[in-house]
Amino acid sequence: MPLRPRLLLLCLWGLLLQQAETDSEGQTTGELYQRWERYARECEETLTAADPPSGMVCNGSFDMYVCWDYTAANTTAQASCPWYLPWYRHVAAGYVFRQCGSDGQWGPWRDHTQCENPEKNGAFQDQRLILERLQVVYTVGYSLSLGTLLLALLILSLFRRLHCTRNYIHMNVFLSFMLRAVAILTRDRLLPTLGPYPGDRTLTLRNQALAACRTAQIVTQYCVGANYTWLLVEGVYLHHLLVIVGGSEKGHFRCYLLLGWGAPALFVIPWVIVRYLLENTQCWERNEVKAIWWIIRTPILITILINFFIFIRILGILVSKLRTRQMRCPDYRLRLARSTLTLVPLLGVHEVVFAPVTEEQAEGTLRFAKLAFEIFLSSFQGFLVSVLYCFINKEVQSEIRRSWRHRVLHLSLRDERPCPHAELGPQALPSRSAPREVPITGSTLPSGPLHGPGEEVLESYC
């Protein structure tokens, strides 16, 4: 049997076994498989004996689930629920629907909701309701993050005094969060219109629409991967400043750009090739063959673990420096807690919580807990990063206040006009010199600056 039909058979067989594991019909796995084989054999015999109709038609075939007869082009075919299903007596009157395109090719989707196990429908509806609510949550989160990230990116771009390697990396992190949000929101807009829902028997997915849908999936995977690699760049750069260089902000920015935007292509492109060759089904939104999904999942897990170890190392450095300053216990704990909470969203440390739990292990309550945790924090992560590293950053606030003061002074000097009857003198002339500007090198804390190599870096980040 060719590899692709074999994979489809394995996926179908796993689905049937999952639904039949609590079946009350008394069939064993061997009996179910024998019934399926007999159904497939009878389908082939029926199609061989039948005479294909004239004109443009979709060929009769067995798609590993149900037997399809020859169908005229641009019509919706229907087939009775396959009798090998363990719960067939409950769905004997049901049908499976599939669209035959105008080009004589079967559409990739089929509607088999009338043939599903009725005992599982209640649980399915509950799960669907939970997923719909989670979708609302992350839609709000990504939309909010997109707006704040755009504003933060404009602020760091417009104020030249804020231009430095550290903020350049921040800007790329903001951009990666924005691309991730746009890609996910766009994909969600495409899937409901391109993918049929239960009861929609006439919807079909044309070749162009299918290509657009898969392209959206590819772009989404790249943007998500780029987001994780740029979080890794933040961790590597901060570790480089604190441990290797000892406080210098002069880094190899081109290498960081190559790592942040180039590394995701190293695992997204192989995933696209393997997916196209071995699991080229529907819109690529389902990962039935887990081995293919691990091509993308493995590099992301590696970036999460590396950033977690960097996070632990930075906390160790911070603890040692705070102890050196002999801070009082309340101040010590407050500073450590604030630094921890500040670095968690920037490095994506929260991902470690469910990183050991694979997709295969996550079932039932654990699966929904993992989804809720990751979806909520990932969607609002961009919002938190933009607030912590732009809007409440003391360096950014100082630059905005300085620019505002200069703007107000400029307007007041422009509107002020000399009086012709007044006695002019040196004391009556307004001063044209601006207040002395103090170079901004980083944010300072009320507890006072740290001293020593790398201290200014910790002040800027923590």
Curated annotation (Swiss-Prot):
GO molecular function: G protein-coupled peptide receptor activity; gastric inhibitory peptide receptor activity; peptide hormone binding
Location(s) in or outside the cell: Cell membrane
InterPro entries tied to this protein: GPCR_2, GPCR_2-like_7TM, GPCR_2_extracell_dom_sf, GPCR_2_extracellular_dom, GPCR_2_GIP_rcpt, GPCR_2_secretin-like, GPCR_2_secretin-like_CS
Keyword Signal recorded: yes
Tissue specificity annotation: Widely distributed including pancreatic islets, brain and various peripheral tissues.
Residues the record marks as carrying a glycan: 59, 74
Bilayer topology term: Multi-pass membrane protein
Protein modification: N-glycosylation is required for cell surface expression and lengthens receptor half-life by preventing degradation in the ER.
Cell membrane in keyword set: yes
Disulfide bonds: 43-67, 58-100, 81-115
Transmembrane residue ranges: 136-158, 167-186, 215-239, 252-275, 291-316, 339-359, 375-395
Extracellular-side segments: 19-135, 187-214, 276-290, 360-374
Residue intervals annotated with topology Cytoplasmic: 159-166, 240-251, 317-338, 396-462
GO cellular component: plasma membrane
Family, per entry: Belongs to the G-protein coupled receptor 2 family.
Subunit structure, interactors included: May form homodimers and heterodimers with GLP1R.
Protein's name according to its UniProt entry: Gastric inhibitory polypeptide receptor
Species whose genome carries this gene: Mesocricetus auratus
Gene: GIPR
